[in-house]
């Protein structure tokens, strides 16, 4: 089940990146404490480390990761921001995930 492992790793990576970007947003836009920058930096460090765990060429990982990031950002919109995604948000996420699957799981000769 390497596909499930890859997708799970992408989802965890996206969550770390989103949290690492959301916390400074809270400080800058919502007037929250500057101390949020500490966990934000740690989250972005974890994000970077997680990217190194993907078992394929970095360019392919970055390209495919973008599809999962889009999906996770739409989930964040729904769960954290409390905004229900539109049909177009869901279709766009599905297309992005399809692109990720093609990039990551298509047969290749090495």
UniProtKB/Swiss-Prot annotation:
The organism's taxonomic lineage, starting at the top: Bacteria, Pseudomonadati, Pseudomonadota, Gammaproteobacteria, Oceanospirillales
Keywords: Cell inner membrane, Cell membrane, Membrane, Transmembrane, Transmembrane helix
Keyword Glycoprotein: no
Species, as recorded: Marinomonas sp. (strain MWYL1)
Matches recorded under Pfam families: UPF0060
Record's keyword annotation contains Transmembrane helix: yes
Localisation: Cell inner membrane
GO cellular component terms attached to this protein's record: plasma membrane
Membrane-crossing residue ranges in chain numbering: 7-27, 33-53, 63-83, 87-107
Descriptive protein name: UPF0060 membrane protein Mmwyl1_1139
Domain of life: Bacteria
Alphabetical list of InterPro entries matching this protein: UPF0060
